[in-house]
Each structure stands twice: as structure tokens, then as C-alpha cells.
Amino acid sequence: MLQANKIIAALEKQEITHVVGVPDNGSRTLYEQLWAHDKIEVVLTSREGEAYGLASGLYLGGANPLVLIQNTGFFEAGDAFRGTAYNMGIPLVSLIG
């Protein structure tokens, strides 16, 4: 069972500023609590690949983002991950469920 409050506390401890991704049924509870949270901004994308490009830009702008996607979405995001985060050497943390 997903315990959103514990995950959010861990994100705060790591000073995560943004959570970028595509909500799904498994992450719904976490997204709902993040939307009510005032220290972490939620940025939704229509595809998982967009999340890596957007999170990379946020990092370059001084933010500390986390990518939150479902496991099948990571396959869709492969080229975007390689083309931005990996090739540019951007240290992004991903929570893939």
C-alpha cells in the first residue's frame, strides 16, 4: 500500500521542489496529497517522455525535480531520458511504480 505521507516527507528531506509526471491509478493518492502540499509543485505532462525533458529544464534552471511515472511509461520515455538527462549528465531522480 502506498503511503503518500511518508513519501512526501522523504521528498521534503531531499529538498525536492517539483514532481513532474503523468498520474495513474497507482500514484493517484500521492498526486492528490502533493496537490494539497505547499512546498512541492506538481507539473503534469501528457507523456512520460515529456517529464524527463521538463525535469531536465527545471534542473538547469536551479530546481530540484523528481520524475514520477508508471513502469510502462519508462519504456515510452527511453529516448527522452537518453537525449536529455543521460546525454546531458543531469542528475534526475525517478520514482517509477
Regions found by a protein language model. Give the residues of each.
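Thiamine diphosphate
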Residues: 1-97
